[in-house]
Every structure is written in C-alpha cells, then in structure tokens.
C-alpha cells in the first residue's frame, strides 16, 4: 500500500515537471503593410498630341511706281493645326516636394495660316506654315499630392517655317518664298499625374515665339515674318 502511494506521488511530480517545460507561444503582432511611396526622380520618355494656333504677322511696305506712293501695312494671318511628337526628360524630387527637371521635345506640325485677295491694299495670296518645331526646357514643379505635380516650364524653341507670298501687281509687287529654321523661346505650365510607378499622364500649355526675320528687304520694299503661337497638348510618359 505504501509503495502504491509513493508511486502516485512520484507520477504527480513528474506530470507537473513536464507541464512546466511546455512553452506557450504568444500570437505574433500583425505585420504593417508596406507604404506605397512614389518619387518623381528619374528619367522618362513619352508621346504627345494636341492643337496649336496663333496669329502670324507680316509687316510690309512696297513702293507703288504707278501711283508714286508707298503702300504699307501688315498681313495678320490666323493660323492653326494639329501637332504631335515625342519628349524625353529627367526629374529630381527634393525633400520639400519641389521637383526640378529638364525636358526636350520634337513636334510634327500642320499649323498653317493663309490670306488671299485684297489684303491690306494688295491683291494676291500669302501663306505661312510651321512644318515642325521643338523645345529644350527647364521645369520647376511642386507635388500637390504624392502623385500629382503642377509645374512651370520655359526655354529655347526652334522650328522650320515656310512662307510664300505673291502680292501686288507689277508696279508694287512682293513676290518671295522662304523655307528656314528659326529660333526663339517658349514659356508655359502644366500638370502631370502618376497612374502607377512607371506611367504618367500630363496636360500642358506652351506659348512659343519663333522670332522675326526679313523675307524681303530691297530698295523701297520690305516684308517681315513674325511667328508665334499657342499650344495645348496631352502626353503619356514612361518613367524609368
């Protein structure tokens, strides 16, 4: 009987010791989901399309030998057409949300303006067309939200401008054509939105001035060309 009691006590102590060795694991804390951060820093390439228009001015003066008087005025040609092209650039985003960037683009253009019959006292026709143009610009932006940037932009503009004039009669005539690359400046603003970490959409406005040049400057006659226009376009960029 005594041996049975001793065996029972020994078994009870053994069970207690085993229970003390059992480790109960605590449930692990939930892991926080990674924060989806976006940075504008990096290079990109893209495409764009839009519409451009403006008023091309052509101041002129021609001496009318029959009436013995100087005929002067300006042919203000309303121009417009579609534009489309490609762009590439690089952005640097600062800690305060400011984004510094540089961008270049090249555009095909159908922007054309013409006028005919009895313009400013001269009979005939005048036509000017921007065949293509491009820009090299700086961009200064600010992140209104993590994925939305608004910016201003400006820099160098250049383009090929073709002009043809056949104005006046034999006594006071301006007949000429020109097909030259012109340089000027551009200034504008836009907004760009990151769809995801690689693709962005933008809308942009640019004012472009391709400068002034003499088309005719002989004797008592001259004809100048002043080409400037407004561009509104949308674009799609792929960010590296």
Swiss-Prot record:
Q: How does it assemble?
A: Oligomeric.
Q: Which GO terms describe its molecular function?
A: porin activity
Indicate where this protein resides in the cell.
Cell outer membrane
What's the protein here called? 31 kDa outer-membrane immunogenic protein
Q: Which GO terms describe its cellular component?
A: cell outer membrane; pore complex
Keyword Ion transport annotated:
yes
Task: Give the gene symbol.
Answer: omp31
The biological processes this protein is annotated with in GO are: monoatomic ion transport
Q: Where is this region: Epitope recognized by the monoclonal antibody A59/10F09/G10?
A: 48-83
């Amino acid at each position: 009987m005594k041996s049975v009691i001793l065996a029972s006590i020994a078994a009870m102590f053994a069970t207690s010791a085993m229970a003390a060795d059992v480790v109960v694991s605590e449930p692990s804390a939930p892991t926080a989901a990674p924060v989806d951060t976006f940075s504008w820093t990096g290079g990109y390439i893209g495409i764009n399309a839009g519409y451009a228009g403006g008023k091309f001015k052509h101041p002129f003066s021609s001496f009318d030998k029959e009436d013995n008087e100087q005929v002067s005025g300006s042919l203000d040609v309303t121009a417009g057409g579609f534009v489309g092209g490609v762009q590439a650039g690089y952005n640097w985003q600062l800690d305060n949300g400011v984004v510094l960037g540089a961008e270049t683009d090249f555009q095909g253009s159908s922007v054309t303006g013409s006028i005919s019959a009895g313009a400013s006292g001269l009979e005939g026709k005048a036509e000017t067309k921007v065949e293509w143009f491009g820009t090299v610009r700086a961009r200064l932006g600010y992140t209104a939200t993590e994925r939305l940037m608004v910016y201003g932009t400006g820099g160098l503009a250049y383009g090929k401008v073709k002009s043809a004039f056949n104005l006046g009669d034999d006594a006071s005539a301006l007949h000429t054509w020109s097909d030259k690359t012109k340089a000027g400046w551009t200034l504008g603003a836009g907004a760009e939105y990151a769809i995801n970490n690689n693709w962005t959409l933008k809308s942009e406005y640019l004012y472009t001035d391709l400068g002034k040049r003499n088309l005719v400057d002989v004797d008592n006659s001259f004809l100048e060309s002043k080409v400037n226009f407004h561009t509104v376009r949308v674009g799609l960029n792929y960010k590296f």
